[in-house]
Amino acid sequence: MSVGKTTLVNALKNSPEFKDYHFRTERSKHLMNLGIPLNTDSTLKGQLVFASERAAELMQEKIITDRTVIDVMAFADLSESMKDHEKFYLNATLFYLIKEYDILFYVSPEGVEIEDNGVRETNAEYRTAVDEKIKQIVGMYRKNTITIKGTVEERIEQVKKAVAQYV
């Protein structure tokens, strides 16, 4: 889903405030090249790969990532290939990891054009469905989420401000 999360994380790498942080960005293209189906074609096995990457990230201190277990939960819920019970049990397990994030940002897609990177789904309706699902999951399980939007520069400042208040 193209909302500028990877762009934001890559921009934060250049900020002196985050020099001691580890950064991780999406690996969808790499995983697709391994034969893992994405988007509406995603499978339980594929979502388990994504989930294991997100869980591994949570074992590190001072990490900034553009994906969370919430993304995995949303994409699993919207998969047309997964069975309902697979979605339920995967998401019921991932639910326990949501609290592991020190700060969780919801990055609004408002004003961001869908970018065709050859991997992500470019269907605007699907993008909206993913966004709505993410907001639903966040609303149910993580009340203290910070919404950021605007230009990349504005988003950087919003992240810096939130992190400065936390640390």
Description of each model-found segment:
Residues E26, R67-V69, Y106-G111:
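Short loop/turn segments at strand-loop or loop-helix junctions that form parts
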Residues K13-A56:
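Conserved substrate/cofactor phosphate-moiety recognition/catalytic segment
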Residues S2:
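Walker A (P-loop) phosphate-binding loop of P-loop NTPases
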Residues Q158-Y166:
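C-terminal alpha-helix
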Residues E80-E153, E157-Q158:
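A glycine- and Lys/Arg-enriched "phosphate-lid" helix/loop adjacent to the NTP-binding pocket
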Residues L8:
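Hydrophobic positions on the alpha1 helix immediately C-terminal to the Walker A/P-loop
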Residues K5:
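Conserved lysine of the Walker
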Residues Q47-K99:
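Glycine-rich phosphate-binding loop used to anchor ATP phosphates in small-molecule kinases
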